[in-house]
Amino acid sequence: MSRIGKKPVTVPSGVTATVDGQTVKMKGPKGQLQFIVHDDVDVKFENGQVRVAPRSETKRARSLYGTARAQIANLVEGVTKGFEKKLEITGVGYRAAMQGKNLQLALGYSHDVVYQIPEGITIAVPKPTEITVTGIDPQRVGQVAAEIRAYRPPEPYKGKGVKYAGEFIFRKEGKKK
């Protein structure tokens, strides 16, 4: 049995939760999110708490209900606080800038890369070498950050490229004569 799945998700004041069959909806100060729980997992909302339990004792149901509980906890955190991912740009001439509703990246190519920001995601550029991705859905925030990083992942010799804040880049030694 999952230790995470056994804990109920407490819904704070200011957040309204509705459970309609297998769909869990959260509405809070930052917005609204929903999550469809797998059929092998049972969801109940009572006394300001969302409880998750496996419908049967199969391995699949037991493995899914801890995940469902974590996803529901992410809904609560997303509509109250939101999620944030920071990226750092390293390299001579590498920089980022906002261009209207798009993110413009100079990453050493012959042209600038223009990234269209999807709906529900906010990107800020406090410095030309820092990018902050924020939103209420952790999956979308992580996906956008990964897409930006994929334009120029950090290389192991000089560490040039786009990396997550706090990410360790394994460095290699260059060729020897």
Curated annotation (Swiss-Prot):
Listed SUPFAM superfamilies: Ribosomal protein L6 (SSF56053)
CC per GO annotation: cytosolic large ribosomal subunit
Keyword hit for Ribonucleoprotein: yes
GO terms, molecular function: rRNA binding; structural constituent of ribosome
Segment forming the signal sequence: none
Biological process according to GO: cytoplasmic translation
Keywords, alphabetical: Ribonucleoprotein, Ribosomal protein, RNA-binding, rRNA-binding
PROSITE patterns the record matches: RIBOSOMAL_L6_1 (PS00525)
Family (UniProt): Belongs to the universal ribosomal protein uL6 family.
Function description: This protein binds to the 23S rRNA, and is important in its secondary structure. It is located near the subunit interface in the base of the L7/L12 stalk, and near the tRNA binding site of the peptidyltransferase center.
Subunit structure: Part of the 50S ribosomal subunit.
Protein name: Large ribosomal subunit protein uL6
Source organism: Bradyrhizobium sp. (strain BTAi1 / ATCC BAA-1182)
